[in-house]
Amino acid sequence: MNNRPELLAPAGDLEKMRFAIAYGADAVYLAGQRFGMRAAAANFDDDALRQGIAYAHARGVKCYITVNIMPSCRDLPELPAYLELLQDAGADALIVADVGVIRLAQKYAPKVPLHISTQTSILNHEAANFWADLGAERVVLARELSLEEIAEIRAKTPKTLEIEAFVHGAMCISYSGRCLISQYMTGRDANRGACAQPCRWNYTLMEEKRPGEYFPVEEDARGTYLYNSKDMCMIEHIPELVQAGVDSFKIEGRNKTAYYAACVTGAYRAAIDAYRADPAQYVMPQFCRDEVDKVSHREYYTGFYFGSEENGQHYGDSQYIREFEVVGMPVSCDADGHTVFALKNRFFNGEELELLQPGKTPYVFRVHGAVNDDGEALELFNVPQMRVHFTFPFPVDAYSILRKKKERPS
């Protein structure tokens, strides 16, 4: 049992990587402009890959590169040079799924460890051992497994084979992400990173002899969201994950914001550290749960970890829960607490805000004395990207974020 599991955070671009690292990630996973499963993310061009890997390594953080699409023949000619680039850049592992890609990786990037993607649907110890025999250093288990099943896999595989599992984020309604609905309906191939997420759309029924007449599946005029999964959240179950033998806790979300990366990474970092400090007396810090509730998310559940989940779908809508919003992202700060933020959403003088910083509980305060670049103390700050100056009674971290509870429509 590994009492210090790795915390693996998403890095959709260089900014998100920096925030994930600042808030406690042990490792980040990212993709180049090709061959990854999140084509909608900004991702990293070749120069940014080198820069990002160097940035992470300078801070003791590992970088895993996703090369986990299911490629066709036309994709293969570009792969050898790309794999050589990743090895030369210092990638700590390649996340792979297709056996053809694995074969090429072993030939063109032989020094880089292989992590077998969740796309391969590893559901049992024989499958895990197969990949270990093929040279894999780590397997990313299918999301469909229970903790009991993970513990059995851990017990029946070599201790040198690392086990990674998703602990937080969006769930695919299809089997471990292998879905053809998007390609069928929109021409966008989910298995090449371009999923249109039709599972989040609303649907109605049409009876064969009544064309054009649409019937809601439930008594809701919007239709019903038949395929719409809730989001996974295991923040309250750190001990169970550790005891099951999970070596790496993976957060989903390369398409999410830097704020999301900061909040969720920081919450899991604090929970893991609290558990490690005293496993026998561990109680999850309440602010950890509060933090994951303050990012944009769908209704949470625990996936399949505690057995077959009958309540994993949310039929009413596919909207995110957004109770908090970012007010400002950092521009500069100094040792005297003078901090400048770029405005993202409006706020009023006297309004309650929260300052989020790495490794600390949020600092709640009412705005007094904030000024613009001209030194004017406005009643309302509402110009996007305007620079707003605050003075705090303590030095503020360069990766701090300002937020507030969202205004309710009147």
Which positions does each model-derived feature cover?
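Short beta-strand elements of ligand-binding domains
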Residues: 65-66, 96, 116-118
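Surface-exposed amphipathic alpha-helical tracts and adjacent flexible/coil segments at the periphery
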Residues: 1-22, 27-30, 34, 52, ...
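Alpha-helix capping/helix-boundary segments
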Residues: 100-101
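Conserved phosphotransfer cores of two-component systems
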Residues: 109
